[in-house]
Amino acid sequence: DHYLSLDLNVTSIEASEPILKEMQRRGVNLSFLVYDVLPLMHPEWWPAGLADGFASWFAVVTRVADRLICISRAVRDDVAVQLELNAVNTTGTPKLGWFHLGADIKNTSPSVHLPRDADDFFGRIVNQTTFLMVGTVEPRKGHALALDAFSQLWRNGYDFNLVVIGKKGWLVDDLADRMSACSKNRSQFYWFQGASDEFLERAYLSCSCLLAASEAEGFGLPLIEASFHKLPVLARDIAVFREVAGDAALYFDGSSSEGLVAGVLRWVRQKELNAIPEPAGMDTMSWQESANALLDQLEI
């Protein structure tokens, strides 16, 4: 028999440990999905207590798991490092594996709602150079870096648009205030919170390029969504984005805002030369293909 834990369960994992060990004693193979280990790597990115709770979860699952199955090769590598750093006392090191998540965007049931001025907005930006960021505004997502870089571009006379779709998250009060002020005072910056799937779909179809600026991710679903919509990608040069997008994206040095400025200008130059990478070249999977890959990892 196989037991597969598909989601993070911080609140009850310690109480469940005796049950899991008894299941294992009776011959059940225990596997846990790992989406990332970022709270262990960067506790400063999370609200108080979350990193400690995650550390407790990680300690238990590495004590009892036969397998830890990660959602990318990059996460698997991170887990391997954390197993060494935390020197977990287990009866045997869990077997590590990885697979990729799927995406069947056309077969989802999207939320439908457009603001009254949506047609005017998209009709305007579709003819302008517009970069799109998708995801909750939180410390690791790179919104501060993007705002710094685009502010520099605007000061230097470039009129590129930056569109952010994503609600305010945690530990970003000052950044959110800055973004709100910028959206009111700068005609090239737009921040939409609570946007519907229909609005996001229009954004993917109307913008010029997806800007993926995160410092770290477990996978990077917006890159896959961009590929489905044939939207070019400019991504921070991190391992998981290289893994997901390969040669189907341009990459920038995210160590400073100047690196992003250089990346944006390089992307624009290559766009003018019709030399940007083709986003449809990403290796994407359906959810059925992803499920089959997961079953392969379980060796069922």
Residue ranges and their predicted role:
Residues 1-300:
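Carbohydrate transferase catalytic cores enriched for Leloir-type hexosyltransferases
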